[in-house]
């Protein structure tokens, strides 16, 4: 399991801040060029701390593909299942996958369990938010909710808001 340091990226990449965040593509370019430190060497503080240049950066990022969001938006079952299978394969073959979404107040308040918000994440008042995202996270795995009928797949995400959010940051 690879646990990269969000704080290293926050502190050592000039194009990012706690208050304003950054664009996923520019952070990805930084990670591709510079790499990052393991979480245990550069733990998350959630502050705009100065960069510790002496911390090693042995974790390299690899760009291998871009997954299109359209199958999720149009909810075509055939495309959706292929899209989900592709993400699962990418997780198994390459490790964490960057995912972005529209964060709602309910998501900010998430504390435990399987988060499910049908209204607001991808649609608001019937309008699709396919091109509007305001937060990126690392997809690190998936599970199967056997308490729902039919069973539903859920994603396991590592958020960058620290261990006080969700279930220790997940």
List where the protein language model places each region.
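Catalytic-core signature of thiol
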Residues: 1-170
């Amino acid at each position: 399991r690879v646990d990269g340091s969000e704080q290293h990226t926050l502190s050592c990449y000039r194009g990012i801040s706690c208050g304003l965040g950054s664009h996923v593509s520019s952070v990805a370019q930084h990670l591709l060029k510079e790499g990052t430190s393991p979480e245990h060497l550069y733990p998350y503080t959630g502050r705009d701390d100065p960069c510790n240049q002496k911390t090693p950066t042995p974790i390299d990022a690899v760009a291998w593909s871009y997954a299109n969001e359209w199958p999720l938006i149009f909810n075509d079952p055939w495309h959706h299942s292929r899209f989900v299978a592709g993400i699962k394969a990418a997780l198994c073959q390459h490790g964490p996958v960057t995912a972005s979404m529209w964060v709602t107040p309910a998501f900010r308040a998430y504390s435990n369990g399987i988060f499910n918000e049908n209204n607001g994440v991808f649609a608001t008042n019937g309008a699709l938010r396919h091109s509007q995202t305001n937060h990126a996270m690392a997809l690190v795995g998936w599970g199967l909710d056997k308490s729902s009928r039919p069973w539903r797949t859920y994603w396991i995400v590592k958020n960058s808001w620290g261990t006080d959010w969700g279930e220790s940051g997940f």
